Amino acid sequence: MRHRLFIPAATALLFALAACTQDELADDNRLPEGEYPVVIRATGLSVEATPLAAHSTRAAVDGDWQGVTSVALKMGDAVKEYTVTASTDFKSATLSRENAPYYWTSRDPITVSAWWPFDNADITQMPAVKVAEDQSKLADFQNSDFISAENRKVEFNNPTLEFTHRTARVTIELKPGTGFTSVAGATVSLMSLSADNGNPTAIKTYNASGNTYEALTAPQTVAAGKPFVKVELGGGTFYFRPQNNVVLEAGNRYTYTVKVNATGLTLEGCTILSLIHISEPTRPEP
C-alpha cells in the first residue's frame, strides 16, 4: 500500500518542479518595470548612386540626419516626442527621451512607428505629405521632405529602426541642344501634379548645381500626354509630355536627362528603367 502511494506522490512532485521551471523561464523574459528605457538607433536616408538607366533608388535630400532634431514615436496607442541625436557623420541617429520615455517590459520585440515632421498641435497623427509649391530655395526644398518608419519590429538586443522617405524625388538634368549653346539661367518646373491633401499642381524646382534641378513631390501618377516638365529659357517656354503615365513612388528617386532644343525638349534618358522608353521630341506649347 505504501508503495502504491509513493508513485503518485513522486509524479506530483515532478509536475510541481516542471511548472516551477516553466514559470521561471517565463519570468526570465520579463524586465523590471521602469528600468530599461527604449532607446533606438535610427538608420536609412542614405543617398545611393544612380547610374544612367538604372533602377530608381531611395530619395534623400541630404542623405543624412542633419536638420532632424526630433521625431514622433508611437508605441501601442501612445505617441511621444523623441529627441534625435545624430552620429558624427550624420548617417545614423539615436532616438531617446529624457522625461517619461517608453520602457521595455520584456525582451520580446516591440512594434513602433515614427515620423517627421509632426504637427505640434496633434502629435498623435502622422501628417499628410504636403510639399512646397516653390522649392527654388534650399530651405523650402529640404522642408518638403517627409520621413517615417511604419509598424516596424524593434529588437531588444539590437534596437534599430530604418526610416524611409514618404516623398518622391525628381531630378532634371538639362543639356543644351539644337539652337542653344548653354542652358544657364533656365527655370524648371514640374507640372500636372495632383492637388490631393492641398499639394501644389506645379512645383518650381531647386537649382541644386550647374544644370541640375530637383524637387520633392507627394507620391502620385502624372497622366500620359500631360505636360510634366516645363523649361523656361531664352524667352521661350518648352514642355515635355510623356507618352506613358509617370508613376512617382514614395522613397524613389527619378533622374531625367532633358535636352533643350529651339523646337522643344527631348528626353535623353532616365534612371527609371520602366520609363526609359517614354522619350520623344516635344514642341513648345502654343
Positions of PLM-derived features:
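Sec-type signal peptide cleavage vicinity
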Residues: R2-P8, L17-S279
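A short, hydrophobic C-terminal helix/tail in secreted or cell-surface proteins
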Residues: I278-P286
